[in-house]
Structures are given as structure tokens and as C-alpha cells.
Amino acid sequence: MLILVLAVGLAAAGSLLASRATRLEVALHTSRDDGRTLVIVGIDDRSLAPEGTTDFGDLSDEHGARADLILALRQQGGQIRAASIPRDLLVEVAPSEYDRLATSWLRGPQAFVDGLCRSLAMPVDHLAVMNLRGFVTLVDAVGGVEVTLEHPLRDEHAHIDLPAGTQRLDGRTALGFVRSRQGEILAGGTWTPDPEGAAGRQRRGGEVFRSLLRQLPRNPVHLYSLAWQTLPETSLSEGTSLLDLVGFHDLSGGFTGVPVEGGQDAEDWVALANDETRAALSQAGLAGGCGV
């Protein structure tokens, strides 16, 4: 009887939580094998930014939601591997029609997943989308994220000024950290533009996501509380549940960087996939094929 009561209670709780998330209208291109791919998208929608939005840009300068951070996780053979996908990567969103992943979201989630499939052969079994406000809430709810900097990093536009070394960032600082595009590092006593460019932004986003995944609570009560706070700022594809998301928390297979051609600075803002791009995605199990 106790087991039955617990089962009913958990089912009811799951149903209640699911109702707090928006459902995405999108036809996913799922895996052709027994593996699963989860794609997490952090969208830059200034209308849904946290309080004090001037820290992250003027609302009047931005229209519509863009894919700002993109993380792909692959679960297969008892391992979970992940890769941070460059937002400036050019993909085919429709036959002979191209767009950057970031701005493809302006067309809707269908164009985004079609682009991943057509250009990268990346299936998507689960899609989770979170806005800026939700990102800040999530980071604060898990007690911040731990990052390590080789050099001090500052970016006036992202409102960050961080020392070298290992440190814990709160939600607002973590958001500035992953969104920094005009950062400077202190090396040899001189502040110089961050030599990593867009690749550094990709790496920082991956570092923060890894820290978040490691810190997701295992206790069901704590997990429920976290989900209750963040799901209103989240959109999920049909058939994607909280348990599906939690199932990807352990990156036992490691994290893969995704090299691209171009897209490394403000003057060169379009990145192209090349053989190294496809090899990295294949290594992570993320290019297993799909059908549009």
C-alpha cells in the first residue's frame, strides 16, 4: 500500500511540474539507434531577462529570441558525452536556405532542429529551452557555479571583472561570464583582447553547463523544488520530462570542443563546419544521422 501511495504521489507531482513548462511545437528528428540526444538551448530574449536588464543590453535594441548557448548531450552505451555547439555556425535551415544557429531561432524551433539535422547530421530526441531569467534562477538555486580562470577577465559590456583562479559565480555573474564577447585578459601586466574570441565563449559556456549538471540535486525533494522554480522559464519538446533531463546529469564520457572555420571575432561572425567539426561531433556520438 505504501509503495502504491508513493507511486501515485510521484506521478501527481510529475504531472504538476510538467504543467509549469511551456511545450514546444516542433517535430524532432530522432536518433536512428538506441541512443538519445538532448539539446539544451539558452535563448537571449530580452523581454524575459532578469530584473536589471540593462546589465545585459537595452531591450529596445533586441527583437525576438536568439539561441545564445547551445549544449548537445548524447546518452549511449552507458555513457553520456557532451559538446558546446558554436552559435555562429552556419546551417541549412531549409533546402538551399542558410542561417546561423543563433538567428535560426527567430524562425522558430523547427528551423533550428532542421538546421542541426541537415548540416550536422545531429538527431534531437529531447529539446529543452531556457531564457536568461531562468538561467540566473537555476544557477542561484544550485548555489552558484564553479569556474577556473587562467588569467583575470573583464568585460565592461557583460559587467564582469573576475580574478584568476577557481571561484564560484552567482547567477548574474555566470550569465555575464558565458555571454562575454568583448572580454579582455590580464597577461604580463597588460590588458589585451581575449585571444580565444568566440572559441572562448564556447568553452566558458561548456564549463558553466558542466558545473550545473554536476550540481543538480539527487534528492527528489530538492529536485522538485529546483524544478518548481525554473520550469516556468523553460520550454520542453513534447515527450520530454524532468526525469529525461536528470538522466543526462553525469558526463561520464567527457566534454568535446567543436572546432569551426571562422566566426572568431566581431568582423568574422559566421562560422563554417569543416572536417574537424564533423570529426569532433562524431567522436561525441552526435553525428549519427537523422532525416528531414
Predicted regions located by residue number:
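Non-catalytic, solvent-exposed segments at the cell envelope interface
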Residues: M1-V292
